[in-house]
């Protein structure tokens, strides 16, 4: 017998934490706006927004939020731009560790941190030409919470 599990995007009753970087705030605020609108569209009413200085500081806050067991998912939003950050590789590498925290705590941790070469690319991914990656991250969080509940 083959069984296929497929989750929907109904977020009613879910509680999410959004951790957003203040660095490159003109980008991250657009990502946050997209995420909050997406949550609203999917029926999520309970969202906690946590602001951190930058993407480098996210793993510590993600770990604390995951360990608290208060949330169904954690969404990380940020923008690391190669041209604007001399230590791009270090910051991008540290922020990429976020996913392992989710596995460790059995909670969906969604990586919505843009890593781009230019400011223009980041702007495109924050709500112009390439959609809004914050909105996509929020929808992914809702779906993953529902999927894990099916397992």
From Swiss-Prot:
Keyword annotations of the record: Riboflavin biosynthesis, Transferase
Entry binding sites for 5-amino-6-(D-ribitylamino)uracil: 23, 55-57, 79-81, 111
Task of the protein: Catalyzes the formation of 6,7-dimethyl-8-ribityllumazine by condensation of 5-amino-6-(D-ribitylamino)uracil with 3,4-dihydroxy-2-butanone 4-phosphate. This is the penultimate step in the biosynthesis of riboflavin.
Enzyme class name: transferase
EC number(s) on file: 2.5.1.78
InterPro entries: LS, LS/RS, LS/RS_sf
Short name of any one Pfam family annotated for the protein: DMRL_synthase
PANTHER family listed in its UniProt record: 6,7-DIMETHYL-8-RIBITYLLUMAZINE SYNTHASE, 6,7-DIMETHYL-8-RIBITYLLUMAZINE SYNTHASE DMRL SYNTHASE LUMAZINE SYNTHASE
Family as reported in the entry's similarity comment: Belongs to the DMRL synthase family.
NCBIfam families documented for this protein: lumazine-synth (TIGR00114), PRK00061.1-4 (NF000812)
CDD domains: Lumazine_synthase-I
Keyword flag Transmembrane helix: no
SUPFAM superfamilies in the record: Lumazine synthase
GO biological process, one term: riboflavin biosynthetic process
Alphabetical list of Gene3D superfamilies matching this protein: Lumazine/riboflavin synthase (3.40.50.960)
Residues the record marks as active site: 87 (proton donor)
Cellular component aspect of the GO annotation: cytoplasm; cytosol; riboflavin synthase complex
Record: residues binding (2S)-2-hydroxy-3-oxobutyl phosphate: 84-85, 125
Domain of life per record: Bacteria
Pathway info: Cofactor biosynthesis; riboflavin biosynthesis; riboflavin from 2-hydroxy-3-oxobutyl phosphate and 5-amino-6-(D-ribitylamino)uracil: step 1/2
Known catalytic reactions: (2S)-2-hydroxy-3-oxobutyl phosphate + 5-amino-6-(D-ribitylamino)uracil = 6,7-dimethyl-8-(1-D-ribityl)lumazine + phosphate + 2 H2O + H(+)
This protein's name: 6,7-dimethyl-8-ribityllumazine synthase
HAMAP family, alphabetized: Lumazine_synth
Molecular function via GO: 6,7-dimethyl-8-ribityllumazine synthase activity
């Amino acid at each position: 017998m083959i069984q296929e599990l497929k989750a929907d995007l109904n977020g009613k009753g879910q509680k999410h934490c959004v951790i957003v970087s203040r660095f490159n705030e003109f980008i991250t605020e657009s990502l946050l706006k997209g995420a909050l609108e997406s949550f609203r569209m999917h029926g999520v009413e309970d969202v906690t927004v946590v602001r951190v200085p930058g993407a480098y500081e996210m793993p510590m806050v993600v770990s604390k939020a995951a360990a608290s067991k208060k949330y169904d998912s954690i969404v990380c939003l940020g923008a690391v731009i190669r041209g604007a950050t001399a230590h791009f590789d270090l910051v991008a590498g540290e922020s990429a560790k976020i996913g392992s925290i989710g596995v460790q705590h059995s909670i969906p941790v969604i990586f919505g941190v843009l890593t781009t070469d230019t400011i223009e690319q980041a702007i495109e991914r924050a709500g112009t030409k390439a959609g809004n990656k914050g909105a996509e991250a929020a929808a992914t969080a809702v779906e993953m919470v529902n999927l894990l509940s099916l397992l």
